C-alpha cells in the first residue's frame, strides 16, 4: 500500500503495527506513509482521557512524558497495578521511538491537536479534522420532555452534567 491509515491502537493491537509497516516498507523498498487518527489522548496519557477518574478532574500531569503520574494517581480503573502497567506501556513505546514513524496524526478537534502538539515529535505532524456530518435542513419541531444522547455512556462524557441541566 501507499498509505496505512490506523485508528486507535491499544491492548491487543499495539503500536507494533507501525514497526511492521516500516519493516515491510524497508524489505520491499516501497515507501508507505502512516496516518494515525487519534480518537483519544493515548499518545500523551496512559489512561487515554486526560482525566483522573478517581477525582473526576481533568489532568495534564502525564503531558510531557511524565507517565509515572498515572501510577501515582491510580488513573486506570483506580488500580495501582493497572495504572503501573499503563505507565510501563506508555513509557516503553515512547522510549522505543515508534511514534517517529507516523507521518500524519489526525486529531478530531483543535483542542486535541493543541494537547498532542505539546510533544515536539508530534507538533509538525498533527492536523485537526473535525468529525463530520452532512448538513441537513432544520425543521422546527414541538418541544417535548426528553433528550437524546448518542455516545458511550460513561462519566467522563459528562452524562451527569447533561442530566443536571435537564432537571
Predicted regions and their residues:
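An amphipathic, basic-hydrophobic alpha-helix
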Residues: 1-3, 12-19, 89-94
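Membrane-proximal helix-turn-helix segments that form the acceptor-binding/catalytic region
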Residues: 23, 42, 54-105
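Short aromatic-enriched loop/helix-cap "lid" or pocket-rim segments at secondary-structure transitions
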Residues: 17-18, 45-51, 56-57, 72, ...
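A short helix->loop->beta-strand "cap" motif at the edges of active sites that frequently abuts
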Residues: 24-34, 123-124
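Conserved donor-binding/catalytic core segment of Leloir-type glycosyltransferases
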Residues: 106, 139-157, 163-167
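A short beta-strand/loop micro-motif in the catalytic core of glycosyltransferases
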Residues: 35-36, 100-110
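Short N-terminal targeting/anchoring amphipathic segment
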Residues: 1-13, 32-37
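Carbohydrate-associated surface elements
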Residues: 111, 132
